[in-house]
């Protein structure tokens, strides 16, 4: 008879413990009900990104000395640098520079180690395309000036949002 009573007591204790755990989880869920939604309607609204964000790489053709440091420090040997040696002036002349953003991991090593600062990270992150070959940017596409996200009219709705000010 005694083992039966202790069995009922253990069962009762386990039931109370389970109810307490369920109640704690439910209280956490209820604490989130009075918060504002976090969802951003992406094509129409955008968040302001950090100033350290690693977006599309901007390239300045005139500053590049074709030293290929960017290729050596890239973990996947991605930048393609074509150059020609000008023998009469003993310098390299850059012919072509391209980066395939379909393969790029945006580590920023090329930007950090460039001795002439001809590479810089922008805040552009929209690379959507139907053909992956369109992600291979040459020096003309890389030289295009980036559009500032702050000047975009869709940002203003997020800037005035109460959840950005409060949280």
Swiss-Prot record:
[4Fe-4S] cluster 2 binds at residues 74, 104, 107, 110. Residues 55-84, 95-124 form the 4Fe-4S ferredoxin-type domain. It is found in: Plastid, Chloroplast thylakoid membrane. InterPro entries: 4Fe4S_Fe-S-bd, 4Fe4S_Fe_S_CS, NADH_quinone_OxRdtase_chainI, NDHI. It comes from the Eukaryota. Its cofactor is [4Fe-4S] cluster. GO terms for biological process: photosynthesis, light reaction. Pfam families: Fer4. Its main location: plastid. It is a peripheral membrane protein. NDH shuttles electrons from NAD(P)H:plastoquinone, via FMN and iron-sulfur (Fe-S) centers, to quinones in the photosynthetic chain and possibly in a chloroplast respiratory chain. The immediate electron acceptor for the enzyme in this species is believed to be plastoquinone. Couples the redox reaction to proton translocation, and thus conserves the redox energy in a proton gradient. NCBIfam families: ndhI, NuoI, PRK05888.1-3. NDH is composed of at least 16 different subunits, 5 of which are encoded in the nucleus. This is NAD(P)H-quinone oxidoreductase subunit I, chloroplastic. It comes from Aethionema grandiflorum (Persian stone-cress). The lineage of its organism: Eukaryota, Viridiplantae, Streptophyta, Embryophyta, Tracheophyta.
């Amino acid at each position: 008879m005694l083992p039966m009573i202790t069995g009922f007591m253990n069962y009762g204790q386990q039931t109370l413990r389970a109810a307490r755990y369920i109640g704690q989880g439910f209280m956490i869920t209820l604490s989130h009900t009075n918060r504002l939604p976090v969802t951003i309607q992406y094509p129409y609204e955008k968040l302001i990104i950090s100033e350290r964000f690693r977006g599309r790489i901007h390239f300045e053709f005139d500053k590049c000395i074709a030293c290929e440091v960017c290729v050596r420090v890239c973990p996947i040997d991605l930048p393609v640098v074509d150059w020609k040696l000008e023998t009469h002036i003993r310098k390299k002349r850059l012919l072509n520079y391209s980066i395939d953003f379909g393969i790029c991991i945006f580590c920023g090593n090329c930007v950090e180690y460039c001795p002439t600062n001809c590479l810089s990270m922008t805040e552009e992150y929209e690379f959507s395309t139907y053909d992956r070959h369109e992600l291979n940017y040459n020096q003309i596409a890389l030289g295009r000036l980036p559009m500032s996200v702050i000047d975009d009219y869709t940002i203003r709705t997020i800037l005035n949002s109460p959840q950005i000010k409060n949280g």
